[in-house]
């Protein structure tokens, strides 16, 4: 076997990005139309115009497909070097926009339920995705404390939970539609608190 063929054999066939995109687009459409429970791998395959084997070569479960369809790839740039107040405001507006997307609203409750049923799924679908953001936010907050921009003792994990939790609950549970108002109100509470100064 030639070196090139050995390499192809070890790596497997090249993935066709058009199939990936068709599957993810079909998944987003079906989530909006049918919700998480009503979205199946069969329906995704039919809508995308691909076979089930092509899907299972790429994703081990419906939960993994849905996750990739609604969540962008998380990179370290998720936290910037803005002043800490502006950075927190940016994270709030970004979380509200992400969790307010029509497909994401339908996906989140199902993904959370799946994550509760399996530690492996919880890590793959929830924890690992947020880890980069948590680490970067913690780094930025530590710098802000040193610079006198942020009071000491604010836990970055709790702050991120407050932001994501409020964005998810308001939009996936309460079905709030006014994203701008939600984000502005959440930013005001997070940055300024609720007690009179």
What are the functions of these language-model segments?
Residues 1-7, 90-97, 135, 139-146, ...:
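C-terminal peripheral helix-coil segments that are non-catalytic and often amphipathic
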Residues 1-34, 38-47, 53, 64, ...:
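Basic, helix-initiating cap at the start of DNA-binding domains
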Residues 16, 133, 152-160, 179, ...:
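Short amphipathic alpha-helix in the helical subdomain of ABC transporter nucleotide-binding domains
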Residues 66, 70, 99-127:
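Amphipathic alpha-helical segments used for helix-helix packing
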Residues 76-108, 159:
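Hydrophobic alpha-helical connector segments
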Residues 86, 106, 120-146, 156-158:
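Amphipathic alpha-helical packing segments from all-alpha helical-bundle domains
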């Amino acid at each position: 076997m030639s070196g090139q063929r050995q390499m192809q054999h070890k790596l497997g066939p090249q993935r066709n990005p058009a199939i990936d995109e068709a599957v993810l687009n079909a998944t987003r459409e079906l989530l909006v139309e049918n919700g998480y429970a009503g979205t199946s791998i069969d329906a995704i395959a039919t809508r995308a115009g691909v076979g089930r084997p092509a899907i299972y070569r790429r994703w081990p479960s419906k939960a993994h497909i849905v996750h990739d369809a609604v969540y962008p790839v998380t990179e370290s740039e998720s936290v910037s070097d803005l002043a800490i107040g502006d950075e927190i405001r940016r994270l709030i507006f970004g979380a509200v926009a992400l969790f307010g997307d029509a497909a994401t609203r339908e996906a989140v409750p199902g993904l959370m339920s799946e994550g509760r049923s399996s530690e492996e799924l919880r890590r793959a679908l929830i924890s690992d995705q947020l880890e980069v953001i948590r680490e970067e936010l913690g780094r930025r907050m530590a710098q802000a404390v040193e610079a006198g921009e942020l009071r000491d003792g604010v836990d970055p994990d709790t702050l991120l939970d407050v932001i994501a939790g409020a964005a998810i609950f308001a939009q996936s549970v309460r079905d709030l539609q006014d994203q701008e108002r939600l984000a502005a109100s959440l930013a005001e509470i997070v940055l300024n608190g609720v007690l009179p100064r």
